[in-house]
Amino acid sequence: MSVIKMTDLDLAGKRVLIRADLNVPVKDGKVTSDARIRASLPTIEAALKQGAKVMITSHLGRPIEGEYNEEFSLKPVVDYLKEKLSSSVRLEKEYLEGVEVSEGELVVLENVRFNKGEKKDDESLAKKYASLCDIYVMDAFGTAHRAQASTHGVAKFAPVACAGPLLFGELEALGKALDNPARPMVAIVGGSKVSTKLTVLDTLSKIADQLIVGGGIANTFVAAEGHNVGRSLYEDDLIPEAKKLLISCDIPVPTDVRVATEFSETAEATLKSSSDIKDDEQILDLGDESAQRLADILKNAKTILWNGPVGVFEFPNFRQGTEIVARAIADSDAFSIAGGGDTLAAIDLFGIADKISYISTGGGAFLEFVEGKKLPAVVMLEERAKQ
């Protein structure tokens, strides 16, 4: 990957526009989960320390494009940044015709989705973004798979376009896990549907020494082995695909599971063999034997890629499987990389963030990179590096 890195540039006195991923949950005007902002702080601080005139922007939520809506304003992010940074921080609502920024000051440019043409990568909008800066820094891995005006078009027209430390770090960590992994490599793919992760499963089946499936995805594999899965979430039409994967690679299908007769937080868990599931039952977690089997596999891994929980961990009675897997990853000496919203929520719940080698901030971008797809924002940075 050949891109210009922000860390290699002299930013002093330059107008620097950072496209970050500050798309955080907000409730009653307050940020409720600051993980993405925290991940962006080192980039912001590095630019300010160099004496740059720093502007930062992001999308937040899904407002109607081209219309201002206070509900989706970046103001709560600005309030958070004011608490964390010693520099002056202000929010700029109207900025497309130009904005004044002083050295060592941080100006947050309001939600890019308030600008008409953002999502369609409108060229005239991209040029307006580009005219604001001397150096454009793409640091939002979470949106690198989208070709939009603030992630892609602007990089085409800015005087200099580079990768921020967070984006570069994400790409480097994923490259380490996928391009030439230390072996054995174990990949865990959980979540609800095979259909949304079929390409990922197929790609990883060719890279990983061991593929682990969990959640609703594992239910489809249980069904593929001929077992009744009752009212479990599974995809009948994808059983042939699951059978193909079972032939082509080693996938440990759950032999025991926790089931319930209702999908609720208070549902009672019953531990039973995968071959004994009744018509009115649904699988909501792995059984002890199956979870321990996965923990034993992870113990010997040298590289672990984790995307998705292995059960309905949000319900206390059905989080044991995900917790056993999570703690096995945390205790492993392997290089581990985790990504996806539910995965990050599980990491937070079990308090193991400091024991995962790399936590990716991207959901869709993480999966598309794993699938082997080119990320438009990264392709543009590579093109600019050649000029």
Swiss-Prot record:
Q: By its UniProt entry, which Pfam families does this protein fall under?
A: PGK
Question: What are the binding positions for substrate in this chain?
Answer: D21, L22, N23, R36, H59, L60, G61, R62, R113, R146
- A Gene Ontology cellular-component term: cytosol
Stated EC number for the protein is: 2.7.2.3
**Organism superkingdom:** Bacteria
This protein's pathway: Carbohydrate degradation; glycolysis; pyruvate from D-glyceraldehyde 3-phosphate: step 2/5
Q: Which protein family is named in the record?
A: Belongs to the phosphoglycerate kinase family.
The name on file for this protein is Phosphoglycerate kinase
Which organism encodes this protein?
Photorhabdus luminescens (Xenorhabdus luminescens)
